[in-house]
């Protein structure tokens, strides 16, 4: 089986930036962390998840309990699920068109919060890989992190094909921004599906009569512009 480890020198360490770093699922870089090949700088404003991250990863890695965005005050829309809260309001009428979607994104409360721009954080260092999952605010994170993006080699971001949150950026918006900033679409790592109500096939689960709602998309540095990268990055 092909392995990234074969491409990395023994002393190579990948600098990872994770925005929305909760432990809801296994991180795509987890094996690199387990073998000492990656250092993570993560942002997770949920207090319980933030403490879990610090406990799980230890002092080698850095985590901050911050909302990352455009640097302005914003409203955080708390929901009944700690992993579906967002800086954008849930689009409940749309969510109610599908099985098992609105029930996971039920509004609970609103909180005024401060957001931080990635480019305003001085000690992030030279980042190689970015992973983003912030429920509709992905483009806000990237737009306000263009200094950081200059050295990034790959990005894994959640993208949406339906407006689950009012005013959120769609897949086409993220794609246009990333291509304009020197990245090319590489692949999709799985889709989120939901069947329309009231249609349901118990034998097929959520993939019956389905709609593709979201996905994790991977972008890589434009291979036609590799001359713009430093020798260290190319190695």
Predicted segments with their positions:
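Phosphate/nucleotide-binding beta-alpha loop and adjacent structural elements of enzyme active sites
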Residues: 1-235
């Amino acid at each position: 089986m092909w392995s990234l480890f074969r491409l990395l020198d023994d002393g190579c360490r990948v600098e990872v930036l994770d925005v929305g770093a909760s432990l809801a699922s296994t991180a795509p870089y987890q094996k690199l962390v387990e073998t000492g090949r990656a250092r993570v700088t993560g942002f997770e404003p949920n207090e319980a998840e933030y403490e879990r991250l610090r406990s799980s990863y230890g002092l080698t890695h850095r985590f901050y309990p911050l909302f990352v965005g455009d640097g302005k005050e914003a409203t955080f829309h708390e929901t009944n699920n700690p992993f579906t809260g967002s800086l954008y309001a849930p689009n409940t009428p749309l969510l109610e068109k599908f099985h098992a979607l609105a029930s996971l994104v039920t509004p609970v409360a609103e909180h005024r919060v401060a957001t931080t721009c990635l480019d305003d954080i001085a000690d992030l260092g030279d980042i190689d890989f970015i992973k983003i999952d912030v429920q509709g605010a992905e483009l806000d994170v990237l737009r306000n992190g263009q200094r950081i993006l200059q050295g990034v080699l790959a990005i894994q971001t959640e993208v949406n094909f339906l407006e689950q949150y009012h005013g959120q950026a769609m897949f086409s918006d993220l794609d246009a921004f990333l291509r304009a900033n020197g990245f090319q679409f590489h692949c999709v790592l799985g889709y989120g599906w939901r069947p329309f109500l009231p249609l349901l096939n118990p034998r097929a689960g959520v993939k019956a009569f389905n709609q593709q709602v979201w996905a994790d998309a991977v972008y890589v540095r434009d291979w036609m512009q590799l001359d713009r990268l430093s020798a260290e990055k190319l190695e």
